[in-house]
Protein backbone atom coordinates (compact mmCIF):
# COMPACT_ATOMS: atom_id res chain seq x y z
CA UNK A 1 0.00 0.00 0.00
CA UNK A 2 1.74 3.15 -1.23
CA UNK A 3 1.50 5.99 1.30
CA UNK A 4 -1.41 4.39 3.11
CA UNK A 5 -3.16 6.23 5.93
CA UNK A 6 -5.35 4.67 8.60
CA UNK A 7 -8.06 6.59 10.41
CA UNK A 8 -9.32 5.64 13.85
CA UNK A 9 -12.98 6.41 13.25
CA UNK A 10 -14.15 7.10 16.80
CA UNK A 11 -13.20 8.81 20.03
CA UNK A 12 -14.14 8.02 23.63
CA UNK A 13 -16.95 10.55 24.05
CA UNK A 14 -19.15 10.03 21.00
CA UNK A 15 -22.85 10.55 21.65
CA UNK A 16 -24.90 7.42 22.29
CA UNK A 17 -27.17 8.08 19.32
CA UNK A 18 -26.55 4.94 17.28
CA UNK A 19 -25.57 6.97 14.22
CA UNK A 20 -21.85 6.29 13.74
CA UNK A 21 -22.28 3.50 11.16
CA UNK A 22 -24.65 5.67 9.12
CA UNK A 23 -22.23 8.59 9.36
CA UNK A 24 -19.34 6.37 8.29
CA UNK A 25 -21.27 5.15 5.25
CA UNK A 26 -22.03 8.72 4.21
CA UNK A 27 -18.42 9.75 4.87
CA UNK A 28 -16.78 6.99 2.81
CA UNK A 29 -16.27 9.02 -0.37
CA UNK A 30 -14.89 11.98 1.58
CA UNK A 31 -12.43 9.72 3.37
CA UNK A 32 -11.25 8.38 0.03
CA UNK A 33 -10.94 11.90 -1.36
CA UNK A 34 -8.67 13.09 1.46
CA UNK A 35 -6.36 10.09 1.16
CA UNK A 36 -7.57 7.69 3.85
CA UNK A 37 -6.90 4.10 2.76
CA UNK A 38 -8.10 2.18 5.82
CA UNK A 39 -10.49 2.73 8.71
CA UNK A 40 -10.21 1.24 12.20
CA UNK A 41 -13.76 0.97 13.47
CA UNK A 42 -14.71 0.75 17.16
CA UNK A 43 -15.76 -2.53 18.83
CA UNK A 44 -18.89 -3.51 16.94
CA UNK A 45 -20.38 -6.02 19.39
CA UNK A 46 -22.85 -5.84 22.23
CA UNK A 47 -21.46 -4.41 25.44
CA UNK A 48 -22.93 -4.64 28.92
CA UNK A 49 -24.91 -1.45 28.27
CA UNK A 50 -25.84 0.53 25.20
CA UNK A 51 -23.76 3.60 26.02
CA UNK A 52 -20.52 1.65 26.43
CA UNK A 53 -17.78 2.22 23.86
CA UNK A 54 -17.53 -1.53 23.27
CA UNK A 55 -14.64 -2.61 25.48
CA UNK A 56 -16.97 -3.90 28.23
CA UNK A 57 -17.77 -6.90 26.03
CA UNK A 58 -20.92 -8.94 26.58
CA UNK A 59 -21.55 -10.91 23.36
CA UNK A 60 -19.01 -10.99 20.54
CA UNK A 61 -21.57 -12.48 18.14
CA UNK A 62 -24.15 -9.72 18.60
CA UNK A 63 -23.27 -6.92 16.18
CA UNK A 64 -26.41 -4.94 16.92
CA UNK A 65 -28.83 -7.66 15.86
CA UNK A 66 -30.42 -9.09 19.00
CA UNK A 67 -32.43 -7.61 21.86
CA UNK A 68 -29.91 -8.04 24.66
CA UNK A 69 -28.89 -5.80 27.55
CA UNK A 70 -31.95 -3.67 26.93
CA UNK A 71 -31.10 -2.78 23.34
CA UNK A 72 -30.83 -4.12 19.82
CA UNK A 73 -28.37 -1.55 18.50
CA UNK A 74 -24.97 -0.86 19.97
CA UNK A 75 -23.72 2.64 20.74
CA UNK A 76 -22.83 2.92 17.07
CA UNK A 77 -25.89 1.41 15.35
CA UNK A 78 -27.29 -1.88 14.05
CA UNK A 79 -25.61 -4.76 12.27
CA UNK A 80 -27.35 -3.84 9.01
CA UNK A 81 -26.04 -0.28 9.23
CA UNK A 82 -22.55 -1.58 9.97
CA UNK A 83 -22.63 -3.87 6.94
CA UNK A 84 -23.75 -0.97 4.74
CA UNK A 85 -20.87 1.14 6.05
CA UNK A 86 -18.35 -1.61 5.28
CA UNK A 87 -19.76 -1.95 1.76
CA UNK A 88 -19.49 1.81 1.19
CA UNK A 89 -15.89 1.86 2.40
CA UNK A 90 -14.97 -1.03 0.12
CA UNK A 91 -16.67 0.67 -2.83
CA UNK A 92 -14.35 3.61 -2.18
CA UNK A 93 -11.24 1.47 -1.97
CA UNK A 94 -10.91 1.75 1.81
CA UNK A 95 -9.93 -1.24 3.94
CA UNK A 96 -11.81 -2.00 7.16
CA UNK A 97 -10.04 -3.02 10.37
CA UNK A 98 -12.13 -4.45 13.22
CA UNK A 99 -11.37 -3.56 16.83
CA UNK A 100 -10.94 -7.04 18.29
CA UNK A 101 -11.55 -7.16 22.06
CA UNK A 102 -10.89 -10.65 23.39
CA UNK A 103 -9.28 -10.13 26.80
CA UNK A 104 -12.35 -9.59 28.98
CA UNK A 105 -16.10 -10.09 29.30
CA UNK A 106 -18.70 -8.51 31.57
CA UNK A 107 -22.47 -8.14 31.89
CA UNK A 108 -23.01 -11.82 32.76
CA UNK A 109 -26.55 -13.20 32.74
CA UNK A 110 -26.34 -15.04 36.07
CA UNK A 111 -24.05 -15.75 39.00
CA UNK A 112 -22.08 -18.92 39.69
CA UNK A 113 -20.28 -20.24 42.75
CA UNK A 114 -16.65 -21.26 42.55
CA UNK A 115 -13.43 -21.27 44.55
CA UNK A 116 -11.10 -18.30 44.27
CA UNK A 117 -8.20 -16.55 46.01
CA UNK A 118 -7.88 -12.82 46.40
CA UNK A 119 -4.58 -11.48 45.06
CA UNK A 120 -2.55 -8.35 45.69
CA UNK A 121 -3.50 -5.88 42.92
CA UNK A 122 0.09 -4.63 42.77
CA UNK A 123 1.51 -8.17 42.59
CA UNK A 124 -1.01 -10.62 41.17
CA UNK A 125 1.36 -13.52 41.93
CA UNK A 126 0.88 -12.78 45.64
CA UNK A 127 -2.18 -14.58 47.02
CA UNK A 128 -3.98 -12.99 49.97
CA UNK A 129 -5.39 -15.72 52.20
CA UNK A 130 -6.73 -19.20 51.52
CA UNK A 131 -9.13 -20.16 48.72
CA UNK A 132 -12.76 -19.35 49.52
CA UNK A 133 -16.05 -20.00 47.80
CA UNK A 134 -17.34 -16.87 46.09
CA UNK A 135 -20.34 -16.04 43.97
CA UNK A 136 -19.52 -14.12 40.84
CA UNK A 137 -21.20 -12.86 37.70
CA UNK A 138 -19.59 -15.34 35.30
CA UNK A 139 -22.48 -17.16 33.58
CA UNK A 140 -23.40 -16.21 30.01
CA UNK A 141 -26.42 -17.78 28.28
CA UNK A 142 -27.15 -15.00 25.73
CA UNK A 143 -30.94 -15.33 25.96
CA UNK A 144 -31.58 -12.89 23.12
CA UNK A 145 -29.33 -14.70 20.65
CA UNK A 146 -29.61 -18.28 21.84
CA UNK A 147 -27.39 -20.61 19.82
CA UNK A 148 -27.38 -18.59 16.59
CA UNK A 149 -23.84 -18.34 15.18
CA UNK A 150 -22.42 -20.21 18.19
CA UNK A 151 -23.81 -22.56 20.87
CA UNK A 152 -20.89 -21.77 23.20
CA UNK A 153 -21.88 -20.64 26.69
CA UNK A 154 -19.41 -19.10 29.10
CA UNK A 155 -18.94 -20.29 32.69
CA UNK A 156 -16.63 -19.47 35.57
CA UNK A 157 -14.05 -22.05 34.46
CA UNK A 158 -13.55 -20.21 31.16
CA UNK A 159 -12.00 -17.32 33.08
CA UNK A 160 -8.71 -17.11 34.96
CA UNK A 161 -9.70 -14.26 37.24
CA UNK A 162 -12.49 -11.83 38.03
CA UNK A 163 -13.41 -8.65 39.82
CA UNK A 164 -17.11 -9.42 39.38
CA UNK A 165 -17.61 -10.68 42.97
CA UNK A 166 -19.75 -8.32 45.02
CA UNK A 167 -21.05 -10.11 48.10
CA UNK A 168 -17.78 -9.39 49.92
CA UNK A 169 -18.62 -5.69 49.84
CA UNK A 170 -15.39 -4.74 48.07
CA UNK A 171 -13.96 -4.74 44.58
CA UNK A 172 -11.01 -7.08 44.54
CA UNK A 173 -9.11 -9.21 42.03
CA UNK A 174 -9.66 -12.94 42.44
CA UNK A 175 -7.62 -15.75 40.91
CA UNK A 176 -10.12 -18.50 40.09
CA UNK A 177 -9.18 -21.91 41.46
CA UNK A 178 -9.48 -25.23 39.65
CA UNK A 179 -7.53 -27.69 37.54
CA UNK A 180 -4.85 -25.86 35.58
CA UNK A 181 -5.99 -22.47 36.84
CA UNK A 182 -3.27 -19.82 36.93
CA UNK A 183 -2.41 -16.52 35.35
CA UNK A 184 -1.21 -16.97 31.79
CA UNK A 185 2.43 -16.79 30.84
CA UNK A 186 3.45 -14.73 27.85
CA UNK A 187 1.91 -11.52 29.21
CA UNK A 188 3.43 -8.27 30.44
CA UNK A 189 5.30 -8.43 33.75
CA UNK A 190 3.74 -5.30 35.23
CA UNK A 191 2.03 -5.92 38.60
CA UNK A 192 3.83 -9.24 38.85
CA UNK A 193 1.76 -10.68 36.02
CA UNK A 194 -0.52 -8.48 33.92
CA UNK A 195 -2.85 -11.21 32.65
CA UNK A 196 -5.76 -9.65 34.54
CA UNK A 197 -6.93 -6.23 33.41
CA UNK A 198 -10.62 -5.88 34.27
CA UNK A 199 -13.99 -7.69 34.54
CA UNK A 200 -13.89 -11.44 33.83
CA UNK A 201 -10.45 -12.30 32.48
CA UNK A 202 -10.69 -14.76 29.58
CA UNK A 203 -8.54 -17.86 30.17
CA UNK A 204 -6.47 -18.44 27.04
CA UNK A 205 -5.00 -21.59 28.57
CA UNK A 206 -8.42 -23.28 28.48
CA UNK A 207 -8.74 -25.43 25.34
CA UNK A 208 -12.47 -24.74 24.93
CA UNK A 209 -11.81 -21.00 25.04
CA UNK A 210 -8.95 -21.21 22.56
CA UNK A 211 -11.04 -23.10 20.01
CA UNK A 212 -14.08 -20.87 20.45
CA UNK A 213 -12.10 -17.65 20.08
CA UNK A 214 -10.30 -18.95 17.00
CA UNK A 215 -13.65 -19.91 15.49
CA UNK A 216 -15.06 -16.49 16.33
CA UNK A 217 -12.09 -14.75 14.72
CA UNK A 218 -12.79 -16.47 11.41
CA UNK A 219 -16.54 -15.83 11.76
CA UNK A 220 -16.26 -12.10 12.44
CA UNK A 221 -13.72 -11.54 9.66
CA UNK A 222 -15.86 -13.41 7.13
CA UNK A 223 -19.18 -12.00 8.32
CA UNK A 224 -18.07 -8.39 7.94
CA UNK A 225 -15.72 -9.03 5.01
CA UNK A 226 -12.99 -7.37 7.05
CA UNK A 227 -9.54 -6.59 5.75
CA UNK A 228 -7.78 -6.62 9.10
CA UNK A 229 -7.95 -6.30 12.86
CA UNK A 230 -6.80 -4.00 15.61
CA UNK A 231 -5.95 -6.33 18.51
CA UNK A 232 -6.83 -4.81 21.88
CA UNK A 233 -4.96 -5.19 25.19
CA UNK A 234 -2.07 -7.39 24.04
CA UNK A 235 -0.19 -6.82 27.30
CA UNK A 236 -2.83 -8.98 28.97
CA UNK A 237 -3.26 -11.84 26.47
CA UNK A 238 -1.02 -14.89 26.14
CA UNK A 239 1.24 -14.11 23.20
CA UNK A 240 1.23 -17.71 21.95
CA UNK A 241 -2.53 -17.48 21.56
CA UNK A 242 -2.29 -14.31 19.47
CA UNK A 243 0.20 -15.97 17.12
CA UNK A 244 -2.10 -19.00 16.79
CA UNK A 245 -5.19 -16.82 16.40
CA UNK A 246 -3.73 -14.76 13.56
CA UNK A 247 -2.40 -17.85 11.79
CA UNK A 248 -5.90 -19.33 11.92
CA UNK A 249 -7.65 -16.19 10.65
CA UNK A 250 -5.16 -15.81 7.80
CA UNK A 251 -5.62 -19.46 6.84
CA UNK A 252 -9.22 -18.49 6.12
CA UNK A 253 -8.87 -14.89 4.89
CA UNK A 254 -5.48 -14.96 3.20
CA UNK A 255 -1.99 -14.09 4.36
CA UNK A 256 -2.48 -10.41 3.46
CA UNK A 257 -5.12 -10.06 6.22
CA UNK A 258 -3.78 -7.16 8.28
CA UNK A 259 -3.25 -6.98 12.03
CA UNK A 260 -2.00 -4.25 14.33
CA UNK A 261 -1.76 -4.69 18.07
CA UNK A 262 -2.17 -2.33 21.00
CA UNK A 263 0.68 -2.93 23.45
CA UNK A 264 0.46 0.14 25.64
CA UNK A 265 4.00 0.72 26.81
CA UNK A 266 6.50 3.49 26.25
CA UNK A 267 9.33 0.98 26.63
CA UNK A 268 10.69 0.03 23.22
CA UNK A 269 12.30 -3.16 24.51
CA UNK A 270 8.92 -4.46 25.70
CA UNK A 271 7.47 -3.98 22.23
CA UNK A 272 10.49 -5.58 20.62
CA UNK A 273 10.19 -8.61 22.90
CA UNK A 274 6.52 -8.93 22.00
CA UNK A 275 7.21 -8.78 18.27
CA UNK A 276 9.78 -11.54 18.70
CA UNK A 277 7.29 -13.64 20.70
CA UNK A 278 4.68 -13.51 17.92
CA UNK A 279 7.25 -14.03 15.14
CA UNK A 280 6.67 -10.52 13.77
CA UNK A 281 3.24 -11.60 12.50
CA UNK A 282 1.60 -8.29 13.38
CA UNK A 283 2.33 -4.57 13.46
CA UNK A 284 2.20 -2.59 16.70
CA UNK A 285 1.07 0.92 17.48
CA UNK A 286 4.19 2.97 18.19
CA UNK A 287 3.39 3.88 21.78
CA UNK A 288 7.01 4.93 22.48
CA UNK A 289 6.71 7.54 19.72
CA UNK A 290 3.38 8.74 21.14
CA UNK A 291 4.99 9.29 24.54
CA UNK A 292 7.86 11.15 22.86
CA UNK A 293 5.36 13.45 21.16
CA UNK A 294 3.47 13.90 24.43
CA UNK A 295 6.66 14.79 26.32
CA UNK A 296 7.79 17.15 23.57
CA UNK A 297 4.46 18.97 23.72
CA UNK A 298 4.75 19.30 27.50
CA UNK A 299 8.36 20.49 27.62
CA UNK A 300 8.25 22.92 24.72
CA UNK A 301 11.62 24.41 23.80
CA UNK A 302 13.31 22.44 26.58
CA UNK A 303 12.74 19.17 24.69
CA UNK A 304 15.69 18.13 22.54
CA UNK A 305 14.11 17.56 19.13
CA UNK A 306 17.17 15.60 18.00
CA UNK A 307 15.93 12.74 20.19
CA UNK A 308 12.34 12.72 18.89
CA UNK A 309 12.65 9.34 17.16
CA UNK A 310 15.13 7.71 19.54
CA UNK A 311 14.04 4.29 20.84
CA UNK A 312 10.78 4.31 18.92
CA UNK A 313 9.30 1.47 16.94
CA UNK A 314 9.37 3.42 13.69
CA UNK A 315 13.10 3.97 14.13
CA UNK A 316 13.92 0.33 14.85
CA UNK A 317 11.17 -1.62 13.03
CA UNK A 318 9.78 0.82 10.45
CA UNK A 319 7.77 -1.79 8.54
CA UNK A 320 5.98 -2.93 11.73
CA UNK A 321 5.18 0.49 13.20
CA UNK A 322 1.79 2.18 13.13
CA UNK A 323 2.54 5.77 14.05
CA UNK A 324 -0.07 7.91 15.79
CA UNK A 325 -0.36 11.15 17.73
CA UNK A 326 -3.32 10.43 20.02
CA UNK A 327 -6.13 7.90 20.37
CA UNK A 328 -9.14 7.13 22.56
CA UNK A 329 -6.91 5.87 25.38
CA UNK A 330 -4.62 8.91 25.47
CA UNK A 331 -7.25 11.61 25.03
CA UNK A 332 -8.11 13.86 27.95
CA UNK A 333 -10.28 12.14 30.56
CA UNK A 334 -9.32 8.59 29.57
CA UNK A 335 -7.69 6.13 31.94
CA UNK A 336 -4.33 6.36 30.12
CA UNK A 337 -4.49 10.11 29.54
CA UNK A 338 -1.43 11.48 27.77
CA UNK A 339 -2.93 13.86 25.23
CA UNK A 340 -0.46 15.71 23.04
CA UNK A 341 -0.89 19.46 23.54
CA UNK A 342 -2.73 21.28 20.77
CA UNK A 343 0.18 23.53 19.72
CA UNK A 344 2.35 20.52 18.93
CA UNK A 345 -0.21 18.42 17.05
CA UNK A 346 0.46 19.98 13.62
CA UNK A 347 4.17 19.26 14.10
CA UNK A 348 3.47 15.69 15.21
CA UNK A 349 1.17 14.97 12.28
CA UNK A 350 3.61 16.59 9.87
CA UNK A 351 6.23 14.16 11.12
CA UNK A 352 4.20 10.95 10.85
CA UNK A 353 2.33 11.80 7.64
CA UNK A 354 5.30 12.99 5.59
CA UNK A 355 8.09 10.68 6.74
CA UNK A 356 8.94 7.65 4.62
CA UNK A 357 8.69 5.09 7.40
CA UNK A 358 5.69 3.89 9.39
CA UNK A 359 1.97 3.47 8.72
CA UNK A 360 0.32 6.64 10.09
CA UNK A 361 -3.03 6.66 11.86
CA UNK A 362 -5.14 9.83 12.11
CA UNK A 363 -7.36 10.12 15.19
CA UNK A 364 -11.06 10.93 14.71
CA UNK A 365 -10.85 13.35 17.64
CA UNK A 366 -8.10 15.33 15.92
CA UNK A 367 -9.81 15.43 12.51
CA UNK A 368 -13.48 15.76 13.46
CA UNK A 369 -14.15 16.45 17.12
CA UNK A 370 -13.73 15.43 20.73
CA UNK A 371 -16.71 15.70 23.07
CA UNK A 372 -18.70 17.21 20.22
CA UNK A 373 -16.37 20.20 19.87
CA UNK A 374 -15.02 20.66 16.36
CA UNK A 375 -11.30 20.08 15.93
CA UNK A 376 -9.10 23.08 15.05
CA UNK A 377 -6.65 20.70 13.35
CA UNK A 378 -8.77 19.60 10.39
CA UNK A 379 -7.48 22.29 7.97
CA UNK A 380 -3.81 21.44 8.57
CA UNK A 381 -4.57 17.72 8.45
CA UNK A 382 -6.21 18.15 5.05
CA UNK A 383 -3.08 19.92 3.82
CA UNK A 384 -0.77 17.23 5.22
CA UNK A 385 -2.91 14.37 3.92
CA UNK A 386 -2.86 15.91 0.45
CA UNK A 387 0.91 16.36 0.68
CA UNK A 388 1.33 12.72 1.69
CA UNK A 389 -0.74 11.57 -1.25
CA UNK A 390 0.90 13.78 -3.88
CA UNK A 391 4.31 14.90 -2.59
CA UNK A 392 5.74 12.49 0.01
CA UNK A 393 7.70 10.18 -2.27
CA UNK A 394 11.32 9.33 -2.86
CA UNK A 395 14.25 8.97 -0.53
CA UNK A 396 14.32 10.74 2.82
CA UNK A 397 17.27 12.74 4.12
CA UNK A 398 17.11 13.59 7.82
CA UNK A 399 18.29 16.81 9.46
CA UNK A 400 17.83 16.05 13.15
CA UNK A 401 20.87 18.12 14.02
CA UNK A 402 19.60 20.97 16.22
CA UNK A 403 17.90 20.85 19.65
CA UNK A 404 14.97 23.01 18.50
CA UNK A 405 14.78 22.92 14.70
CA UNK A 406 14.74 19.59 12.88
CA UNK A 407 13.41 18.29 9.61
CA UNK A 408 13.84 16.10 6.59
CA UNK A 409 13.47 16.17 2.83
CA UNK A 410 11.85 13.75 0.41
CA UNK A 411 13.44 13.68 -3.03
CA UNK A 412 10.30 12.76 -4.98
CA UNK A 413 10.19 10.24 -7.83
CA UNK A 414 9.45 10.08 -11.53
CA UNK A 415 6.12 8.32 -11.04
CA UNK A 416 4.60 11.27 -9.15
CA UNK A 417 4.88 14.63 -10.93
CA UNK A 418 5.78 17.54 -8.64
CA UNK A 419 6.62 15.15 -5.78
CA UNK A 420 9.27 15.89 -3.20
CA UNK A 421 9.13 18.11 -0.13
CA UNK A 422 11.03 19.69 2.72
CA UNK A 423 9.65 19.59 6.27
CA UNK A 424 10.88 21.71 9.17
CA UNK A 425 9.67 21.55 12.77
CA UNK A 426 10.52 24.09 15.49
CA UNK A 427 9.73 23.94 19.20
CA UNK A 428 11.71 27.12 19.90
CA UNK A 429 12.44 30.31 17.97
CA UNK A 430 12.14 30.89 14.25
CA UNK A 431 14.55 28.55 12.53
CA UNK A 432 16.19 27.89 9.20
CA UNK A 433 18.22 25.10 7.72
CA UNK A 434 20.05 24.41 4.49
CA UNK A 435 18.69 21.10 3.22
CA UNK A 436 19.07 19.15 -0.01
CA UNK A 437 16.11 17.95 -2.04
CA UNK A 438 18.34 16.59 -4.81
CA UNK A 439 19.93 18.01 -7.95
CA UNK A 440 16.94 16.85 -10.00
CA UNK A 441 15.09 19.82 -8.45
CA UNK A 442 17.76 22.39 -9.32
CA UNK A 443 16.40 25.84 -10.22
CA UNK A 444 12.80 24.90 -9.36
CA UNK A 445 10.58 27.39 -7.54
CA UNK A 446 9.24 26.09 -4.22
CA UNK A 447 6.68 27.52 -1.82
CA UNK A 448 5.30 26.80 1.65
CA UNK A 449 1.82 25.18 1.77
CA UNK A 450 0.65 25.48 5.41
CA UNK A 451 0.31 29.28 5.23
CA UNK A 452 3.37 30.13 7.30
CA UNK A 453 5.18 31.95 4.49
CA UNK A 454 4.05 33.77 1.36
CA UNK A 455 7.50 34.09 -0.17
CA UNK A 456 9.03 31.60 -2.57
CA UNK A 457 12.53 30.18 -2.90
CA UNK A 458 14.66 28.73 -5.67
CA UNK A 459 16.49 25.43 -5.36
CA UNK A 460 20.20 25.86 -6.08
CA UNK A 461 22.22 24.09 -8.76
CA UNK A 462 23.41 21.67 -6.09
CA UNK A 463 19.83 20.74 -5.09
CA UNK A 464 20.02 22.70 -1.84
CA UNK A 465 18.12 25.66 -0.43
CA UNK A 466 17.70 27.57 2.81
CA UNK A 467 14.32 26.55 4.25
CA UNK A 468 12.63 28.47 7.06
CA UNK A 469 10.13 27.73 9.83
CA UNK A 470 8.42 29.93 12.42
CA UNK A 471 8.91 29.21 16.12
CA UNK A 472 6.56 26.57 17.53
CA UNK A 473 5.32 25.69 14.04
CA UNK A 474 5.91 23.42 11.10
CA UNK A 475 6.69 24.41 7.53
CA UNK A 476 6.17 22.23 4.47
CA UNK A 477 7.93 23.39 1.32
CA UNK A 478 7.07 21.88 -2.09
CA UNK A 479 7.58 22.61 -5.76
CA UNK A 480 5.25 25.28 -7.09
CA UNK A 481 3.20 23.74 -9.85
CA UNK A 482 3.40 25.35 -13.27
Per-region residue spans from a language model:
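Core domains of carbohydrate- and sulfate-ester-processing enzymes
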Residues: 118-193
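Aromatic/His-enriched, Gly/Pro-containing loop or helix-boundary segments
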Residues: 62-88
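Boundary/entry segment of secreted carbohydrate-active catalytic domains
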Residues: 1-18, 196-205
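Active-site-adjacent "subsite" loops/lids of carbohydrate-active enzymes
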Residues: 178-223, 234
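Active-site-proximal N-terminal segment of extracellular/periplasmic enzymes that hydrolyze or transfer
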Residues: 16-23, 27, 107-109
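Active-site-proximal helices and loops of the catalytic beta/alpha 8
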Residues: 2-7, 23-36, 45, 49-64, ...
Amino acid sequence: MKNGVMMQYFEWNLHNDGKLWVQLKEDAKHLHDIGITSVWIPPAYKADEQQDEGYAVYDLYDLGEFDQKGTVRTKYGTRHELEEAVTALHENGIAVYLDTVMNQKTGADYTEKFMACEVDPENREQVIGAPVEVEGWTGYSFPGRGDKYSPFKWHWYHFSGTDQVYETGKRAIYLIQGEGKKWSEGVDGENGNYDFLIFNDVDFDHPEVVEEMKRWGVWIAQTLDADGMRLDALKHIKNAFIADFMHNVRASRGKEFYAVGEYWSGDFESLEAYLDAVDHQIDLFDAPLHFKLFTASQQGRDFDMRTLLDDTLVQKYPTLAVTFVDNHDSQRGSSLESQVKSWFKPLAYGLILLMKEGYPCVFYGDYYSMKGEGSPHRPILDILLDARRSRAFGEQTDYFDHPNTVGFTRSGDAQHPDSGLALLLSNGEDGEKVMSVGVMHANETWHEITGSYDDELTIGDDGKALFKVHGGKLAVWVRKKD
